Amino acid sequence: MKCGGGCHDGLVAPSEDPEEHVAPAAQRVRAGTLLLANTDLFEPTFRRSVIYIVEHNDGGTLGVVLNRASETPVYNVLPQWATLTIKPKTMFIGGPVKRDSALCLATLRAGVDPEGIVGLRHVDGRVVMVDLDADPDSIAPVVEGVRIFAGYSGWTIGQLEGEIDRDDWIVLSALPSDVLIGPKTDLWGQVLRRQPLPLSLRATHPIDTSRN
């Protein structure tokens, strides 16, 4: 499972900037922003999902769901990348598109400039895309870890804007740490809680609305 070519072959890494710790609320969609599923989005594929935008241009929008771990070990699919993969060392479900392909994101170590490093493509801040055809041994010294996604989420021109207009998604700033979030973290709630009021109150929204 590989994401071939230069289109989806990179990782993005977080920075040590103080700004990482306070993410401002709503902004325009661009590479490096988050799409947070609104509380009324009940479609199973994207309910309470947090999507990291990897590309946003005239050709459309591409992102990966950050909080959908699978049970498939990375070692079973791409064994050469298993050591660099952050726990849980499983494939994540990046979205419904091309589930038989893989896309890899990483966070750079503090102070590393991705410019000129073979196998890395800068996304935003310290987040980069990693070419899965690259040599993991050459990537290891410059990244804190990688996460590999099966498939991705994609929108054609204007499609995402329409979904945002009907309040399916909230556009927010990402922190580098979001990309490699731990397995037991409620990323959806965590992202909301760091927003200003009243948006942060949505983090208390019950998972099962029948309990409300």
Enumerate the language-model features and the residues they cover.
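A short aromatic-anchored loop/beta-hairpin motif
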Residues: 2-212
